[in-house]
């Protein structure tokens, strides 16, 4: 467990925040700092086929230790952290034997309160790693990286545990939706894989949102305010009218489970032009089609009211629900469930209210459900992880590798 924690703390000390505004891959050069460190560690573990390409994708392989054919499987995690909060100068706190108290996050004035974060009530006796309240932690997804490498080290140190080829992949830019864009599935050469990018212990996910970006562009006319009567058209007022036409109960803060939403995420405004940036989510293709049609209907209604085509809608699909690509391969899910049960972990199968690299990879021919890391409150200063949960993730990875070999003997 010490080795696991040391790896994790080493990784979170490296700022790898991605940048959605940068077109290149990786979107930030600093992601390569972690990629290069991981290459060194993979070579120290004497793994085969260790590589990092110009875009920051890291790959390696632990060769099979059995003399019969076993399907190669993969484990994938991402190196970048979310743009939502700073990932620079992360100062983790380790809370030993948590007993239900409110945790003070450094000197920031922020805290983890069990009333606000009730998951803490289920973690009595656990060792926690938190932030100091000024940055995110980076458990999403550096915990996954640490867990994968620790599991590989355990397999190497215990050759009596049978396993086939284990393929390892670490990706850039997952948090900005591009993690799988340049992933070389053929080079990776696994039959299926698992992203280690989930939350609390037991999470096993093979459904995710269908995702679309919706840009609503409102055009106005700017005239000096002193002579504006009958001439000025304020695009911000048009944008406000459009937002008021959207359902107030179908937002992230008002939905859960399999419910989709519209989320106004950004706005760039001026009198002459205002752009509203929405993300639209739904678990079914039919539901997504209805949401797109609804937005277009509201744009058309507003344009008719304004008597001029002053509102545009640009829809861009981001990713799709991997369920349709994973369900034809039920053994992929059954193996993960079998491994969790063998490790005294209760599988908690639920939809991902978001996306992972695995969603894109599944549509690229690599079925790739998602497994827990043991972390909570990703993307913000209240992010934390349990060391106990990290250890359980390692155990499950090792057991998946072992059972895959035993099941194919």
Swiss-Prot record:
Q: Does the keyword Metal-binding apply?
A: yes
Query: Which residues are the active-site ones?
Result: 80, 174 (proton acceptor)
* Bound cofactor: record note: Binds 2 Zn(2+) ions per subunit.
* Positions contributing to Zn(2+) 1 binding: 78, 140, 197
Protein's GO biological process: peptide catabolic process; proteolysis
Q: Which UniProt keywords apply?
A: Aminopeptidase, Cytoplasm, Hydrolase, Metal-binding, Metalloprotease, Protease, Zinc
Domain of life here?
Bacteria
EC category name: hydrolase
Segments crossing the lipid bilayer: none
Q: Drop me one GO molecular function for this one.
A: tripeptide aminopeptidase activity
**What are the cysteine partners in each disulfide bond?**
none
- Name the principal localization, coarsely classed: cytoplasm
Where, subcellularly, is it found?
Answer: Cytoplasm
UniProt EC number? 3.4.11.4
Q: Mind telling me which GO cellular component terms the entry cites? A: cytosol
The protein's required cofactors:
Zn(2+)
Q: Which residues bind Zn(2+) 2?
A: 140, 175, 379
Q: Which CDD domains match?
A: M20_peptT
Q: What PROSITE patterns does the record tag this protein with?
A: ARGE_DAPE_CPG2_1 (PS00758), ARGE_DAPE_CPG2_2 (PS00759)
Catalytic activity annotation: Release of the N-terminal residue from a tripeptide
Family as reported in the entry's similarity comment: Belongs to the peptidase M20B family.
Matching entries from NCBIfam families are given as:
peptidase-T, PRK05469.1, PRK13381.1
Q: What does this protein do?
A: Cleaves the N-terminal amino acid of tripeptides.
Return the protein name: Peptidase T
Q: What gene name is listed for this protein?
A: pepT
């Amino acid at each position: 467990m010490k080795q696991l924690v040391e790896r994790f703390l080493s990784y979170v000390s490296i700022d790898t925040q991605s940048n959605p505004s940068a077109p290149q891959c990786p979107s930030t050069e600093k992601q390569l700092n972690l990629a290069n460190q991981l290459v060194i560690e993979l070579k120290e573990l004497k793994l085969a086929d260790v590589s990092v390409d110009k875009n920051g994708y890291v790959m390696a392989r632990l060769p099979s230790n059995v003399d019969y054919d076993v399907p190669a499987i993969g484990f994938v995690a991402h190196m970048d952290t979310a743009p939502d909060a700073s990932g620079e100068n992360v100062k983790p706190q380790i809370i030993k034997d948590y007993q239900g108290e409110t945790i003070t996050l450094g000197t920031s004035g922020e805290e983890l309160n069990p009333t606000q974060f009730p998951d803490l009530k289920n973690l009595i006796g656990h060792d926690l790693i938190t932030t100091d309240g000024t940055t995110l932690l980076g458990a999403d997804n550096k915990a996954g990286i640490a867990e994968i490498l620790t599991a590989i080290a355990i397999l190497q140190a215990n050759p009596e545990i049978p396993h086939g080829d284990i393929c390892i992949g670490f990706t850039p830019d997952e948090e900005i939706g591009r993690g799988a864009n340049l992933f070389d599935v053929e080079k990776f050469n696994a039959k299926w894989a698992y992203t280690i990018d989930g939350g609390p212990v037991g999470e096993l996910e093979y459904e995710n949102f269908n995702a679309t970006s919706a840009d609503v562009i409102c055009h106005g006319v700017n005239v000096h305010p002193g002579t504006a009567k009958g001439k000025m058209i304020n695009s911000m007022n048009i944008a406000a009218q459009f937002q008021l036409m959207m359902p107030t109960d179908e937002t992230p803060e008002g939905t859960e489970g399999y419910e989709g939403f519209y989320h106004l995420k950004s706005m760039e405004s001026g009198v002459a032009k205002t752009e509203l940036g929405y993300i639209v989510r739904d678990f079914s293709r039919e539901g997504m089609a209805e949401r797109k049609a609804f937005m277009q209907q509201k744009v058309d209604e507003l344009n008719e009211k304004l008597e001029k085509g002053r509102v545009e809608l640009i829809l861009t699909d981001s990713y799709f629900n991997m369920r349709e690509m994973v369900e034809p391969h039920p053994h992929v899910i059954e193996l993960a469930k079998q491994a969790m049960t063998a490790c005294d972990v209760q599988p908690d199968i639920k939809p991902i209210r978001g996306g992972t690299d695995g969603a894109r990879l599944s549509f690229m021919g690599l079925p790739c459900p998602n497994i827990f890391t043991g972390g909570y409150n990703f993307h913000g200063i209240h992010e934390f992880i349990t060391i106990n949960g990290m250890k359980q993730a390692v155990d499950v990875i090792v057991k998946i590798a072992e059972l895959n070999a035993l099941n194919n003997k």
